[in-house]
Amino acid sequence: MSTPFYVSPEQLMRDRADFARKGIAKGRSAIALQYADGILFVAENRSPALHKVAEIYDRMAFAAVGRYNEFENLRIAGVRLADMRGYSYDRRDVTGRALANAYAQTLGAIFSSGGEKPLEVEILVAEVGTTAADDQIYRLTYDGSIADVRGYAVMGGPAEQVADYVGEHYQEGISLAGALRLAVDALGHDSSEVRQLEPDQIEVAVLDRTRTQVRKFKRISDQTLARILSESRPDTAPSPESSAHTEETETVDGGSYESAAGTSAADDAPIAPPEDPDDNRPL
């Protein structure tokens, strides 16, 4: 009789963790940034149909990296949980903390189970408050670990390099234009060669506390994104007069751009699920 093959629990968990990390690293990075009026999400995403950032409930949003079919199932489950709780009790009872705890239990149970592979995903759950101090951002990893982060969070791809760049330049209370420029520049500094990302290569959305609608989530269109980036891009060859007023010309806080507090009916239209939910390409 042959001796059964044995793998220690420690080795099994290490192998599962390595498997999940490698899958997540194949995707592209996503960033969540707190700015003066809410929370900004910026993700490198070249697909116009497959969203990495989505609305969950009135004041809550979801961002993810990794295998699309896996985190899309988590997003749908989160929307259903939030809707059920809001309908059964009160809309104020739907909180980001409760949703993050539910996701943590699901991810942890799948990771510790030997019968199925771990999910190759990392997700962010964000809830915008009435003030910046009330904003909440929760980061959840493949093994169900949950962290309450402040200021900014980066996940997917070369997350450490992108996070280092954000950490060097991030300032509390930054404007929307400044936060967007910082996030786009950070995504371009994910390797030794600096890349210039175009509006059609990134996905941008905000949770804007200044919106009059109950739903605070809004996507930023490519046209608005291009305008904000052009206004916030520093001039590489300033004239003598403009160089004498560098601080004034580089200030974009008061720049004219489309407000995130849109009022059109299209802004509040629910995001339809993609046509091919079985697409397993890493995003």
Curated annotation (Swiss-Prot):
Activity regulation (record text): The formation of the proteasomal ATPase ARC-20S proteasome complex, likely via the docking of the C-termini of ARC into the intersubunit pockets in the alpha-rings, may trigger opening of the gate for substrate entry. Interconversion between the open-gate and close-gate conformations leads to a dynamic regulation of the 20S proteasome proteolysis activity.
Residue numbers spanned by region Disordered: 228-283
Pathway: Protein degradation; proteasomal Pup-dependent pathway
Molecular functions (GO terms): threonine-type endopeptidase activity
A single Gene Ontology CC term: cytoplasm
This protein's record includes keyword Cytoplasm: yes
UniProt keyword terms in alphabetical order: Cytoplasm, Proteasome
Keyword set includes Cytoplasm: yes
Subunit organization: The 20S proteasome core is composed of 14 alpha and 14 beta subunits that assemble into four stacked heptameric rings, resulting in a barrel-shaped structure. The two inner rings, each composed of seven catalytic beta subunits, are sandwiched by two outer rings, each composed of seven alpha subunits. The catalytic chamber with the active sites is on the inside of the barrel. Has a gated structure, the ends of the cylinder being occluded by the N-termini of the alpha-subunits. Is capped by the proteasome-associated ATPase, ARC.
Protein family (similarity comment): Belongs to the peptidase T1A family.
Protein name (record): Proteasome subunit alpha
Organism annotation: Kribbella flavida (strain DSM 17836 / JCM 10339 / NBRC 14399)
High-level lineage: Bacteria, Bacillati, Actinomycetota, Actinomycetes, Propionibacteriales
Gene symbol of the encoding locus: prcA
